[in-house]
Amino acid sequence: MLKVRKTRAEAITTVCAPGQPYELQELAVHGCRHRVFVNAPQTLHDLYRDNLSDLDFIIYEQQRLTFNDVYQQASMMAAAMVTDFGIEKGDRVAISMRNYPEWIVAFYAATSIGAIAVAYNALWNSGDLANGILDASPKLIIVDQERLDRLALCEGLPASLQVVRTRALENDYIFSLNWSDVLDAHKDSVMPEIHLDPDDNATILYTSGSTGFPKGVLSSHRAIINALLSWELDECLLIEMGVHTPVNLDFQRGMLLAIPLFHVSGLFVSCLMCLRAQRKLGCLYKWDTESALALIEQERLTVCSAPSAITGDIISAGRDSVHDLSSLRVIGGGGMHRAPKQVKSIGEFSDLLQPHTGWGMTETNGLGVGIFGNHYLERPGSSGLCSAVLDIRVVDKEGHVLVSGESGELQIRGTTLFNGYWNQPDATIQAFDGEWFRTGDRATIDEDGFVYINGRFKELIIRGGENIGCGAIEDAILEHKDVIEAAAYGIPDDRLGEEIGVTLYVHREIDEGQLREFLSKKLAVFEIPRYIVQQNKPLIRGDTEKIQRRQVKLEAIESLGLSSIKDD
């Protein structure tokens, strides 16, 4: 068992004491008392301006932009937003494109002038894109070629919508201005001076919608910045506890951007976390394992935070790769439970490589709990310890707080929570129990404070009167050496109410009989799946990189020839 020099509580007392860089104080935020960082930048614009340098920031194919370059381009675009497009404080500016450098420049520009940056899912079809535009009512949308073509197919768009295109040709069906032309017209401009407050709204990111259209999550500058500093603090606490030793490198650290920027982990955990650390960000046109390995070697990237399917690809392919991956120091990420065998494989890949994971939501700006290094290797099923600026609890159906080891709904409160669902006041009210946000996640907290996420409350299969958690089935299946990802779900059954189905992303096809025999040593008889679907590609994920269980289930019903079954 790992020996620690200090407990986490003792480390927080030391590192967050008055006069320290990560000093914490209680402050009234929206009528509630929350812990905030005293020395935090007040706004996102302050964050950008305070971290200018000639070091590389964005690496995309042959393009390299320094921190100064990005801010300079953002100043030009911000000036255009104010003078050419009439963007005022509180107006929405939408971004919909691949992970191009322009995505980040546009985000810088919008959030520096008090606009609300709206991140649309680049995978949306034209109907979804139209819904997103009608929902957020942006004054301006910035798109690439694919999104411009989809925009041209949208029906019912407001005539007032202004469009800027990048890396795109003109479309005969929709008027747009060219990104480069807009910048050139303002090449001598400086960043407009707009007064911003920490509690001003900064972003709308869309949550995964399992039943209807995703909800827009509205967040403030303060919430986002305190999330960023809390992740920084976590590393300092590990050092203070004596469970992590910082490594001095003679080259610039870098992050592999393996997640879309419209996702909270891509935008905040990967991108904005680079600023204060002065890390470079390696971007890809799309996910490709070989391209990722080559980029890691070329740029000597040190961190990759991504879903388990991607980190699994890196570790699996990296063992036999011709590429030098010795620069990597941290691999992991949240979004979905990582198989214990993958956690172990990260630890075994290199003595210098540390695994990590965490749990957060779009509504918490990605912050929640986290776990790193030996703590994670010892508890591969845990999502970690609570952030220092948040409080968590587990409650039963009646709202009574449960003790360690008891399973219930995880609730959370603190500085980084969102301001509400855009245009959905009723949904916002329903999401809270007083000042506590109802996550909808089933969890337990052990006696040491480590949180274990056991699935969503709606992810229960009721088979013959037995309540069966999807997480337990998935954990057992993930122990099989050929399974990369697993999703369990209930399939309607006339006799039992529901039968158990699973969809697996596998290295190679597994004999179903052998798999059931394997599971018989780990699960009760009534927990062994009746229906098994195998595929050689990752499972479908939503905006928050969580597996879309309902969509996986519907596709399984179709592939199994059970389409006559009616599912609620």
Predicted regions and their residues:
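Conserved AMP-binding/adenylate-forming core of the ANL superfamily
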Residues: 36, 40, 54-88, 92-100, ...
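Conserved pre-ATP/AMP-binding loop-to-beta segment of ANL
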Residues: 187-206, 213, 247-254
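ANL superfamily adenylate-forming
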Residues: 22-25, 62, 149-198, 225, ...
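Gly/Ser/Thr-rich phosphate-binding loop
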Residues: 276-277, 301-305, 315-378, 391
